[in-house]
Amino acid sequence: MSRYRGPRVKIIRRLGVLPGLTNKIPQLKSSSINQSTSNKKISQYRIRLEEKQKLRFHYGITERQLLNYVRIARKAKGSTGEVLLQLLEMRLDNIIFRLGMAPTIPGARQLVNHRHIGVNDCIVNIPSYRCKPQDFITIKNQQKSEAIISKNIEFYQKFKRPNHLTYSSLEKKGLVNRILDRESTGLKINELLVVEYYSRQA
């Protein structure tokens, strides 16, 4: 299944707030619609499916990519769900987004694809590149690159940056301090339901 490129508002109306996909807030449904929905019995499969879809759309990855991340997480030590979130959060496109260098993950991916971003002073054009603790995220030394990212950083100042990341406005450089903890994930998600969804595939 390919990466979703359709209307983003349609997705957040169904799944709720997904800051990685869009910074728009879904409009609340009318009380009559909510009442009719609450009277319907929602299957466990649908609940797991929707949690899985939240991860896919928030991080902007394909079905195959998510399945591969689940398989890697299963082989790692620790909680499979927590490791899965760490793998997704340490993607370069997500790090750029969480640093505030881009308004969304698709926007961050575009910066990477257009070679605006460096890791440890080397240009990286792979959005799925897995960052590590003590990695420096830098802006390509071009006026256009700096103007785009500085504008995003200025807008992001009103939001709280997660503790595992720091950004120096003076040096125009981000730093991955450590692997994030569960509470720092910027998404309301039950990752265990995602693991259960893939239990027969991974």
Curated annotation (Swiss-Prot):
SUPFAM superfamilies: Alpha-L RNA-binding motif (SSF55174). Part of the 30S ribosomal subunit. Contacts protein S5. The interaction surface between S4 and S5 is involved in control of translational fidelity. PANTHER family: 30S 40S RIBOSOMAL PROTEIN, SMALL RIBOSOMAL SUBUNIT PROTEIN US4M. CDD domains: S4. Transmembrane segments: none annotated. It is found in: Plastid, Chloroplast. One of the primary rRNA binding proteins, it binds directly to 16S rRNA where it nucleates assembly of the body of the 30S subunit. Residues 90-153 form the S4 RNA-binding domain. Pfam families: Ribosomal_S4 (PF00163), S4 (PF01479). Keywords: Chloroplast, Plastid, Ribonucleoprotein, Ribosomal protein, RNA-binding, rRNA-binding. This is Small ribosomal subunit protein uS4c. InterPro entries: Ribosomal_uS4 (IPR022801), Ribosomal_uS4_bac-type (IPR005709), Ribosomal_uS4_CS (IPR018079), Ribosomal_uS4_N (IPR001912), S4_RNA-bd (IPR002942), S4_RNA-bd_sf (IPR036986). GO terms for molecular function: rRNA binding; structural constituent of ribosome. It comes from Hookeria lucens (Moss). Belongs to the universal ribosomal protein uS4 family. GO terms for cellular component: chloroplast; small ribosomal subunit. GO terms for biological process: ribosomal small subunit biogenesis; translation.
